[in-house]
Amino acid sequence: MECQRCPASARNPATVESRKEKFCDECFIKFVSTKQRKQMMKDEYFRNLFKVIYPFEKEGSVSKILLPLSHSDSGSLVMLDIVHDLLLEQTKQHNNRTGFTVDVLTVFTEENVSVIKERMESLINEKMSQLNKISNIFNVHFIDVNEFFNNASEVSTFIIDNENFEIFSKSKSVDDSNILTLKEILGKYCLNNSSRSDLISIIKTQLIKHFAYENGYNAIMWGHSMTKLSEVIISLVVKGKGSQIATFLDSESFDTLNNKPCKYKNLYPMKDLLSVEIESFLQIRNLAQFLINVEETNVKPNCLIARKSLPSLGQQKLVKNMTINEITNKYFQDIQNDYSNIISTVLRTADKLTQPKSSMAKPSQCQICQSKIYTNPSNWLNRITVTSPYPVETTEEKYLFKQWQDSKLGQSHTHYVELLNEIKQGASNSLDVEDGDVKLCYGCLILLNTSIKDKNLVWPKVDTMDITANATNKNKELSQILDQFEINSDGEE
């Protein structure tokens, strides 16, 4: 079996088969790299970001790019590897000059910080140090996921009135004695794995975007493959957040954060590549060593011809125990080798979507996920839902109702009613107009109503996150907090 892209006179043995075409290692690496670079040059804005601009002394001639790197995600690592090769080419062609610099940002949790730093140190020594000897092209940052809570001076308790789906909130100041943590939020409020997964994803995305906003980057490069983007699209629809799809995929407009315009655009350079192609690239370039889940990565589906038959990592999860993200991931992983056209169709269709027309009197953003709100979900749910219970009448019904009141579920409902009345009272007595005008998107409202304990959640107020130059000592600027986690080009902490 020979490579179909090599010259006819010197064909190498094929090692990869993808999209009904056979590749050798060298041709496949070129195929993947070309797909990514094509997306990086998709329009004039991004072409000016990534190419070398003369004269070098001109202001803005070197762009700042933020690359969020997850050490459990192959896509972002492969993207970084291809970007590294592009920068290396630019230094050779332009007398040690490059068109852009890359800041790698990793969000970590307490459980994996040590292994992440170990993997990053290896990555720096093998990939980044060579370029940084020429110039300060790569910078590496770490941020604790708990900084999402530590940087807010106020938090809000959101609660849903289950009679009319109206949302109430109560704000309070944060000090050293009542700082929240991710572990506390997930353990105290989330009833299932789907809600935990959703909140973690929201927190990480917001941290990355806040970091980009504060430090003046020109673009954020996300490592989502075509498969991953399709998973996210279907997940958003299932979660009631379909209106976010157009904004999520938008690479033409500058992003917004808390209704403020940002100076960066979002880019998905891997959107023309299937995840099996990314996994194959990872294996060929021996990049799995930089991930924290090496064993799991090695058994992921790929399109290598000499694929090793590796044992499963254990019994697969039952569907009922999977999160929405895991279910969509499993579906697309199962079909992408034989029916990749389904994945591309999902993405092409989503790319054609535009933002819905808003029926709101004024622009509004969800207080949890920060997505735009186009219609009031509380009013719509109240119109289509019957929430009034049938009255208790017979002796048997009264007996069963008493049993329910004494159960854990009944006690939880009693606690919910008490908390709702307390927050309602606080909201009615508050002089803060914003507290009486709290809005959540439909997806977060449903999340709060069905997957959060007692239908209430404590969440930082994004507009009080002091991560700007005017930050106080208690709420340090985000970049200052990151200083203690910096790794320089020599791999030293």
From Swiss-Prot:
GO terms for cellular component: cytoplasm; cytosol. Changing residue 428 to G: In strain: YJM627. Pathway: tRNA modification; 5-methoxycarbonylmethyl-2-thiouridine-tRNA biosynthesis. One of its GO terms (molecular function) is nucleotidyltransferase activity. Its main location: cytoplasm. The keyword Magnesium does not apply. It is found in: Cytoplasm. Changing residue 436 to S: In strain: YJM230 and YJM320. Interacts with NCS6 and URM1. May act by forming a heterodimer with NCS6. Belongs to the CTU2/NCS2 family. Present with 2860 molecules/cell in log phase SD medium. This is Cytoplasmic tRNA 2-thiolation protein 2. It comes from Saccharomyces cerevisiae (strain ATCC 204508 / S288c) (Baker's yeast).
